Amino acid sequence: MAARFSIQPIGRFAGESQPVKRPKEFACFSYDDNHEFRLDGSSLKYYYTPQLGADLSKGFDTFQKLDDTGDDHLDSLLKTIVAHEQETGKKIDANVVTWRGMMTKIMATPFDNMDGFEMNATLYQVCPSFIEENNAYKVASRSNEGNNNRRRRGPPLEVMQFWGYKFETLSTLPAPWAETPREFIENRENEVVNNKAQYCSVVRTGIGKSVLCLGGEVDAIWDSKPEEKGSPINWVELKTSAEIRNTGDMENFNRKLMKYWIQSFLLGVPRIVVGFRTRDGILVEAKDIETHRIPETVNSYPNPKWNADMCVNFAATFLDWLSANITDEGVWRIKREPQSPTIELFKVEETGHGDILSDEFKNWRIKLALGPSNES
């Protein structure tokens, strides 16, 4: 029997934003150039202004592309949590553990009527909900997206996706500017693009009554990381978008700003640099946007297409509902069909936790619950 959460009418989520806690990084991890997990910050990149006029299609034929069709579950995030808990000797206090991408989908739901989603969730040790993307749904959605793209005019979807990674390559250095050879800086346009390396931030944040542990990739840092854990970090999110030529383009861009804002808001990223490009992928502008100013900017236009406070209030209310309905073990499916006015929740496995939780994580949590060993 499925429980249903009504998205409509979204007017009930209007009003002042429910309380939110500033995201604080308490751990991080990296994937190297081969996408191997590393429990460190070795893949951190540093922002450096890109050269305008660059062709974002250049290097597409040598693109070292990550195959992300496999199901990695929450494994890397859980490994990082285990290492943190081993260091502190206590369990993190979050009651939701998930990837930033899952929370982005949830927060965008009131104003994103076209995209559906499927997630798997499980309860472990009474309180926390661990939520992952349903991989089969992700793969099928991408296949449909590719089929739809073949029917539209313009560059292939794969090329347009590459433009975003090319912009990241043009806008980042592997070390601070003072430590980077001039030859490397001037040769960025010829660098082989590789999206396998990633730096992932793990933060504690809060929306309404829920305390969240989120993991997500950050593209670059503006200056350097502060020594003290939990201090604000000058992260930079990098995006590409078609240049704005008319009112319709501006409306489309304001719609895109919703996900830009949510993604950055959830990890505490204060700055977004948008690379505006021509229709055939030539970089014409790099615009610096402060994350906290996006909601007021969008609201300054007539008939704004989304509202930040409503996104927060929707997420807070939905997470409360989820907590009240996921009350025992097993694997639960969180499902929204495209254009559906409801989100469904139902069990797909009566017992256990599926593959959402790794054996390493479960064994560690059992050991932690038993307390200090009496072995001498």
Swiss-Prot record:
Annotated positions binding substrate: 200, 217, 239, 263
Cofactor notes: Divalent metal cation.
The reaction(s) this protein catalyses: a 5'-end NAD(+)-phospho-ribonucleoside in mRNA + H2O = a 5'-end phospho-ribonucleoside in mRNA + NAD(+) + H(+); a 5'-end (N(7)-methyl 5'-triphosphoguanosine)-ribonucleoside-ribonucleotide in mRNA + H2O = a (N(7)-methyl 5'-triphosphoguanosine)-nucleoside + a 5'-end phospho-ribonucleoside in mRNA + H(+); a 5'-end triphospho-ribonucleoside in mRNA + H2O = a 5'-end phospho-ribonucleoside in mRNA + diphosphate + H(+)
Cofactor(s) named in the record: a divalent metal cation
Keywords: Hydrolase, Metal-binding, mRNA processing, Nuclease, Nucleotide-binding, Nucleus, RNA-binding
Subcellular location: Nucleus
A Pfam entry, by short name: RAI1
Main location: nucleus
Subunit structure: Interacts with RAT1; the interaction is direct, stabilizes RAT1 protein structure and stimulates its exoribonuclease activity. The interaction also stimulates RAI1 pyrophosphohydrolase activity, probably by recruiting it to mRNA substrates.
Family membership noted in the UniProt record: Belongs to the DXO/Dom3Z family.
Protein name per UniProt: Decapping nuclease RAI1
Species name: Gibberella zeae (strain ATCC MYA-4620 / CBS 123657 / FGSC 9075 / NRRL 31084 / PH-1)
Taxonomic placement: Eukaryota, Fungi, Dikarya, Ascomycota, Pezizomycotina
GN (gene name): RAI1
